[in-house]
A protein has these predicted regions:
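Generic structural marker for isolated residues within well-ordered, non-membrane alpha-helices
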Residues: 23, 57, 101
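Acidic, His- and aromatic-enriched active-site or binding-groove loops in soluble protein domains
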Residues: 53-80
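Acidic helix/loop microenvironments that form the catalytic cleft of cell-wall polysaccharide enzymes
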Residues: 37-51, 119-132
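Short acidic, glycine/serine/threonine-rich helix-capping segments at coil-helix boundaries
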Residues: 86-158
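A charge-rich, low-complexity, intrinsically flexible signal that marks solvent-exposed coils, linkers
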Residues: 5-8, 48-51, 55
Length: 159
């Protein structure tokens, strides 16, 4: 908008139905696996922000078997293993940064692990959050974002 804030539109039910039908048709026609259904921001996080955090990825996964989504129980299992008092310090160290950069790369994000926080890393985390944690997309690898990432890697190891 004119103030420099990002504004993301809501997707109404009619749009979601049309998106699902179109994506299903294209995926079937070209034999695209459901796990390869991605958004611009997943592919080019430093340049693209669409479809944004309000895009209904979870609904497309649950209702139409499109895309990827994590299992809540698996996420919770990873989350309960985290020690809150040390997590932030661990993840802000070079080893921690390298660890989560590598995890994002394992899931398919085009990030080169360096052990340093840079704009590319922040934008990649933000894109990941748009897709899998749309309630909070600040580009910070916090405990919940890490738990979701681990749950996805466990569910989709060959991604």
């Amino acid at each position: 908008d004119s103030t420099g804030l990002r504004v993301f539109p809501e997707y109404d039910n009619a749009q979601v139905l049309k998106i699902a039908a179109l994506v299903k048709d294209i995926a079937n026609r070209y034999s695209i696996p459901a796990t390869n259904i991605l958004g611009h921001s997943d592919i080019a996080p430093t340049r693209k922000q669409d479809p944004g955090p309000k895009f209904p990825w979870k609904k497309l996964y649950n209702d139409y078997q499109l895309g990827m989504w994590y299992d809540e129980a698996t996420k919770q299992n990873f989350f309960t293993q985290i020690i809150p008092e040390t997590f932030g310090v661990e993840m802000s160290s070079a080893q921690g940064i390298f660890k989560y950069q590598t995890a994002l790369k394992t899931l398919g994000y085009g990030l080169d692990p360096s052990g340093m926080i840079d704009e590319s890393t922040k934008k990649t985390i933000e894109a990941f959050q748009y897709h899998f944690r749309p309630e909070k997309y600040d580009g910070v690898m916090d405990a919940e974002t890490w738990s979701i990432l681990q749950a996805l890697i466990q569910k989709y190891p060959s991604k």
